[in-house]
């Protein structure tokens, strides 16, 4: 969802600006979550990013999901930027020697032999383990509340599913 048009007419994707930081998410619910984690819960930017990602995965599953990827570029204070690669991880019992004995010189591009375990969720946990300040219960409470109480459905979801036919009882 890359936007180049003016979004000032669209209340679903508001523009936020300030003098003490910035929050950029696709959903306003994710931005509000990040804001609350920073201000109400006294978390840091990594806590806010994790909370926003959890909400985004819930309210915008067509854009990001826990069963997917979570690559992050992080900039801890007084450290060089680093990349946390949350694409996929190899299954626990994966052994490259098994591929070699089958005649492969590298992991194939398609098929079961190249399957990886989705790592978005584990990359969020790793980021919090390294740089987070708050506990996971505090960070995840906003996503949990939206999941329990409901949230406005994004039009991208409804448009994506209008072509599907639901089964009917005979």
Write out the residue ranges for each language-model feature.
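Noncatalytic scaffold domains of N-terminal-nucleophile
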Residues: 2-40, 45-164
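A short, hydrophobic C-terminal helix/tail in secreted or cell-surface proteins
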Residues: 165-170
């Amino acid at each position: 969802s890359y936007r180049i048009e003016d979004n000032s007419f669209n209340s679903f994707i508001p523009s936020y600006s300030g003098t003490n930081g910035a929050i950029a998410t696709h959903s306003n619910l994710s931005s509000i979550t990040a804001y609350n984690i920073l201000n109400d819960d006294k978390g840091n930017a990594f806590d806010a990013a994790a909370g926003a990602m959890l909400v985004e995965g819930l309210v915008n599953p067509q854009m990001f999901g826990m069963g997917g990827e979570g690559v992050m570029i992080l900039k801890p204070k007084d450290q060089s930027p680093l990349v946390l690669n949350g694409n996929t991880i190899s299954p626990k019992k994966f052994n490259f020697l098994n591929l070699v004995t089958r005649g492969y010189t590298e992991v194939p591009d398609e098929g079961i032999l190249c399957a990886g375990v989705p790592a978005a969720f584990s990359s969020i946990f790793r980021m919090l383990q390294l740089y987070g300040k708050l506990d996971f219960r505090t960070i995840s409470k906003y996503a949990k509340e939206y999941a329990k109480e409901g949230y406005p459905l994004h039009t991208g979801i409804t448009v994506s599913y209008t072509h599907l036919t639901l089964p009917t009882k005979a």
